[in-house]
Each structure stands twice: as structure tokens, then as C-alpha cells.
Amino acid sequence: MISTAIRVARVGSAAELAAAALVMLGFPCLMLAALVPSVPAFAAAAVVTYLADHYLHRKGSYLINRLSKVRAGLSIRFLIRQLLLVLLLVRLSLPGHAVLYGAIACFIAFYSLQAPHGALTTLIRNRRKMPVATRNVDLKSRIRIPDAPPRRLLHRSAEKMLHLDLFAVAGILVFAGLGSAVAAAAGIGLTLGLGCLYVLLLLPYVRGRKIPPKGEAVLSAIDDWLAAYRPETVLYFSGSRNSAYQVNMWLQTMERLDARPLIILRERVILNNLAPTTVPVVCVPGGVHLMNMDLSTVRVALYAANVGKNIHLLRVPTMKHVFIGHGDSDKLASVNPFSKVYDEVWTAGRAGRDRYVIADVGVRDDAIVEVGRPQLAPIQAWEDVPEALRDAAGEGVPTVLYAPTWEGWDGNPGNTSIVLAGENIVEKLVQADPPVRVLYKPHPFTGTVSAEAGAAHRRITALVEKAAAERAADRRFASDPAAQAQAKTELDRIEARLAVLAGADGGKGDEAEATRDGVVDIERHKEVARLRAEWNTAYWRSFPAYEHRVITGAEPRLYDCFNVSAAMVSDISSVVSDFIASGKPYAVTDSAELGVEEFKRQNTAVRAAVILSNSAAELGSLLDAVRAPAADPLAGDRKELKRYLLGPDEPKSIDQFNAAVADLALKSEARNAGQRSQAGAAEDAELATALPGQRSPAADDTDGATTP
């Protein structure tokens, strides 16, 4: 029942649900205590509402956001509590006492301070929100960007300001209970004094040298940097916070480009969720600002997603535009008709080319280039996995990864196995004999569209956690507590060092300060990469090799899960195509029940897979391949399919990718040279046809008149 209430209220935990209930019940209790009247009861209810409200705000509760939508926002709740305190004084037969008038005057004056406080905080935030935010771009030498105000002044500023009424409320309650007018006066004085002080502390940040430069100066500095840096290849991305992984997967590839790279983002939220990189990053939310940027040296633009904002860069004719996507699969999204707006579409292997031919959505065959998948380099075949990771993966109890995709937007039952087959798959895996370990890593979008998918995910999570608890109590499975303790100590050390390195990046500032100081330290970047690799090894060794796990969040990454797994179960998505790079056995669920032959006909990536029905009855074939690799009947098919989907192993994918960039850059330059030649020829023709005694208008002629 509690879990149902948590889902309905959209809160994160039972504690959050309890705090929400206390807020809802606390205000009626305040009114009742004021009417009785009872000072102790009122004080107790006030403490409860203060603490519960603060807890919900600290958690960023969904309910708190909803209250503001029904005119019960933060300011209203504080005002109601203060009015009820005045009611308490009236009910205590103190209508003519100076403290009553003082309380009323205090709360009126206190609320009069809210307007300048809110105006100042809004003005500071707006002025510090520059038209462009960057990383790894040297703006510090070009414009002066002052330090951000102390975080304690702006972070949750409205809540902090309103909580200054605590002194007045406490003092008035002391007076109501004990008759001490001095306590009331002191509380009222502190509330008003601190409120005025808060407003005064904000004033310096809206004047003088504490104000960041205007937008025109920032944009001019960006153009000056672009002219000096001369970017040649751009990775362009626009999307929601949850889609940041789509651009993050290309960062290492951009770092390894031969051409000078630049990343252009359109949303600040993507910049905030961007993984560390050495590539210069420019976030330009405004379309007009982007279209006015000087990108004349860029010859190739790469697009990782088909979104409406792409048009703002697609309109630039001096560069060639390429769709590279964010995964290679047989989903309809992989053959989006929108792709025909690009000069070229790059696919991993021959399968991508054939996919467009079959779909017949207007993408020309000569516009398709096979470049491999350079971001798959971290995926390793089992024999290439380091020994430390193989030990952690537990060769005696092989690991099977269940990585279903999400439900999608269209309600197609074939999108994900999680609803119709997920529980069957996990039940059979946790009950397998000989045993296997299950890693369950759902797609981060799971449950965002379909409540049914969200419910299935929670049931599968509970199933995995229950099986893990049962296995931990099973004496057949032995662990090494000393080794696990050592690994956990190593994890703590690595995480502490990563925290220090993250703090050294100046993360305490705001966006403007991050733009000023956000030039990556190459040595620190290398150290972070090394530490993350060490963290991954320590993570897998920090718990028994037989322990089932639910893995969510950014770490460990999907490819890390690939490397410790002997096999995978998934759905039609780029996850399958990526896993094929490992050469390991895999199974794919036919959730739409098309039948094996039709399912394989429609989906290239499953041609070397074990095909599962929703009952998962065929799962035994996958487990047989794990236990006896030499007798695996699909091993040869997987090798052939890997080449078809992902291209040849040689030359390396990054080399193919660099060659494709260079080739397209030459085409772009040839086009631009042709345009310049035509423009020159047109100008010569105009001069040749000019009447005797006339000349063509010069750039500095104001009316186009000629001179004799």
C-alpha cells in the first residue's frame, strides 16, 4: 500500500511521502491549535511544518512543485502560518497588546522585503546567464567575467529568505507562552534586520565590476576565439537532459579526429550533463546567435540526432552536413526520412546501407558512407578482457546481462521486452542450473511514457534483488570477504580522489564562472580516465562474482557490463549491434510475436541471435552456448554478422572515420572554391558590360551612382 502511495504521489521514498503527509496535516493542526488556543500544540505543529517543508525542498519533491501550481506555494504556506500565529494571539485575549501590533507590522514589513529580494536574485541570475556558455574555450583572456556571488546567497534563495521569519515566530511564541515581550521584540528585530541585510548583500552584484559583460561582448569574444582556433569539424547536438548520452558517446571519437574539432550544443542542460572532454564546447541556446556565429572555417558538420533545431546549422552552405546518429539498429529511427536533408549519411557497415535501400525513404545510395563504429573500441572479446576483470566476472558462474530498451513513443509492443517477457527472462536466468549471475541494466528512459513498463521494471528489480538475497544465504556460493573489503577500500580511495579532482575544476561557480574557468587540465583529464578504469575493476571485485545486480545510473557504463558478461539478452536497439562487436552469444526477444523467420527478415542484427518468445522458453540455447562455447552453432554466424553490421576490423574504425571526414572536407572546399570562382566570373562579366565612362558600384558607394 505504501509503495502504491509513493507511485501515485510521485515521491522518491517512504520518508518523502511521510514528510508530504506532515505538511498536509500540519496546517490544519496549526489552525486548530490557534482556535483552541494552545501555545504548545501550535509550537509543535509549527516545528513539524517547518521541518517537513524544508526536507521536501531539499529533496526537490514533485509534490512541492505541484503545490505551487494550485496556489499553495512556498510564500503562501509561510504567510498562512504567520496569519495563524496572529490568530493565536487574538484567541489568547491579547487584541490590544503591543506585541500583536508588532507581529502584524513585522509580517507586513517582512513581506515587503520579498519583492526587492526576489527582484535582485532574478536580476543577478539573468545578468549572469550569458548568451553562450563554453568549455575548453579561452574567453578569460578576451573578456572579464567576474566571480559568481557566493552560493549561499542564491541557492534556494527564496526558501532562505522566508525562513528568516523563524526568529519572529519563535519570539512571539515565547511571549504567548511565557509573557516575555523582550523575546518577541528580539525575534521581530532579528527577522527584519536579517531580511534587510540579505537584500543589502545582493545589491553589489547588480552594479559595477561584479556585472558580467553584455551579450554583444560575449558573442564578439566567441567570434574572436573562433577566428583564432579555426575549427574544421563540428559535432552538433540538441536534445533533452536524458538524451545527453547520445552526444557523450561521440566525445572520444571527436578527441581522436585529425581535423580541429568543435562541439556545438543547443541546451544548457546538455552542457551540464556532458562528460569530461578535451574538445572545445560551445553551447548556443539562441538560434539567431548560432546563425550569426562565424563558422566559415568549418567544412564538416556531424549530427548525432534528428531534431528540429538542426535547421539552424543545416542552413549553412559552406560546410557539408552528415548524419552519424547515436547507434546503429533496425529500429525505424535508424531510417528516418529526415536523413535525406544531409549531404551524407554515415553507417557502421553494409547493413546500414542496405537498411536505407530497403526503407526507400529518399536517401541516395551514393550519399551513404560506411565508417565503422569508432566508439565501440572499449568493447572487448572475452579473451581480450583483462585477467582482473575476468576474475571479478567469475568464470565459474558466468554472467548474463539483461539490457532491455525502453518502451518508445508509439506503444508498439515490439519496442521492448520488459512488459511482456522481462519477468519470464529474469526468472529463468536466476533459476538456471548450472547457475548464472544476472546483471539487469534497463534503459534510462524506461517508464517515462508507459506506466505499465515502469511497473514491470520495478517488479523485475524486486525479483533480481530477492534472488540476490537468496543466493547470499546459499552455502553453495562462497565469497572472499577480505578481497571484497579490499576492493571497497580501493573504491573509496578512487572516489575520494575523483571528488578532489572534480572540486579542482571549480564546480562551485555558476555557468558564467564555469565558462571563464572551464579549460580542461590535460594531465588531470588523463588521471581521471585512469582512475575511472581502476574504479571499474574495483567495482566488479567489491561484491561476490555470483551476486545478481540491478545496475542503473551512469556507472558502471553499458560497455563495462558487456566486458564482464558472457552473454546478453536484449531487444531491437543499438545495444544489440554494439554487443555484436564482442563476438559473444546473445538473445533478442520477439515481443511482437512476428515469428522467428519474419523477425530475422525484418531485423538484421538478430540473424545470429537466439530468438526468444515472450515466454523465454528458448533461453536454454543461449545458456548452452555460454557453458560450451566450442559447440556454439551460431559462433560463425556472429563473426560474419559482425563484419556486415560494423564493418571490417581493418583498417580500424577511427581511421575509416578520419578518412571520411577528410574526404568530405575536400568536397566542401571544392564546392566553396567553385562558388568563389562563379562569383568572380559574375563580377568580371558585370565589369565588362558596364557602359563607357561607368564603373560598378563600389562597396563604399552610398547610392550606387557612378563618377565620370
Q: At which residue positions do the language-model features occur?
A:
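Short hydrophobic beta-strand element within catalytic cores of glycosyltransferases
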Residues: Q82, R156-M161, V569, P585-V596
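N-terminal pre-catalytic "stem/leader" segment of glycosyltransferase-like enzymes
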Residues: I2-R71, V99-M291, A665-P708
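Active-site and donor-binding regions of nucleotide-sugar-utilizing enzymes
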Residues: A109, L235-I379
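Conserved catalytic-core segment of nucleotide-activated headgroup transferases in glycan assembly
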Residues: R241-D258, A377-E534, L645-D655, N672-S677, ...
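A nucleotide-sugar donor-handling region in carbohydrate enzymes
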Residues: T191-C196, L200-A217, V341-L420, K441-T448
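Short acidic alpha-helix that forms the nucleotide-activated donor recognition element
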Residues: N292-S296, A554-V564
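Catalytic binding pocket for nucleotide-activated donors in carbohydrate/polymer assembly enzymes
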Residues: E511-V520, S574-L645
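Acidic donor-binding loop of glycosyltransferase active sites
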Residues: V298, N563-S573
